Design a protein with these regions (language model features):
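Aromatic-Pro/Gly-enriched surface loop or interdomain linker
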Residues: 1-38
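A conserved amphipathic helix/loop scaffold
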Residues: 2, 47-166
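Substrate-binding cleft/loops of secretory-pathway carbohydrate-active enzymes
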Residues: 32-34, 40-41, 86-93
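Short, well-ordered secondary-structure micro-motifs within conserved domains or adaptor modules
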Residues: 33-49, 53
């Protein structure tokens, strides 16, 4: 299971006093988001875990942007909302404040950041898997864990809501 982030998320959630629903992109388009406080998208690009080509649907992306802006929390794990063919690799990059450089961009530098204290967010001794080629999209995300200039855990305010990347 080391390759499948969503399995670890499911295991963690199963021990918490929270209600969990699995929703589809069709559910999002049908307006179901108002029932939820948090949406999690986890997995590798192109996989059913992450959503693959479903992220090409502008209606899905627009509805999620609006929902977060109005107070929701979007948690993206590994390569959330990743799909080729758009100005950002992660369709939810404006919400997350993080994107991935797949080599398609000519980068003239990255936003500089300082790693902020994550006390109370990460349990003692816990780590976040290191990811390569990640960068901040606007320099406003709070970086709570990083390695070699790559943000690994961030929180980014988006309207009344936020995006969390790990």
């Amino acid at each position: 299971t080391y390759m499948h982030d969503l399995i670890h998320v499911n295991e963690a959630l199963s021990g918490l006093p929270v209600d969990v629903d699995f929703i589809s992109f069709e559910n999002v388009k049908a307006g179901i988001l108002d029932k939820y406080d948090i949406v999690i998208n986890a997995g590798r690009a192109g996989s059913a875990w992450s959503g693959g080509d479903a992220w090409k649907d502008e209606d899905v992306v627009t509805r999620l942007y609006r929902w977060v802006y109005e107070g929701g929390a979007f948690i993206g794990i590994d390569q959330p909302s990743a799909v080729e063919g758009f100005d950002s690799y992660y369709r939810m990059a404006p919400v997350l404040g993080v994107d991935e450089d797949t080599g398609a961009k000519v980068c003239h530098g990255k936003w500089q950041f300082k790693v902020e204290d994550s006390k109370g967010i990460l349990p003692e001794g816990a780590t976040v898997p290191e990811k390569e080629n990640r960068f901040l999209t606007d320099g406003k995300a709070k970086v709570l864990a990083a390695h070699d200039g790559n943000p690994d855990l961030t929180i980014h305010e988006f309207g009344k809501g936020c995006g969390v990347y790990m």
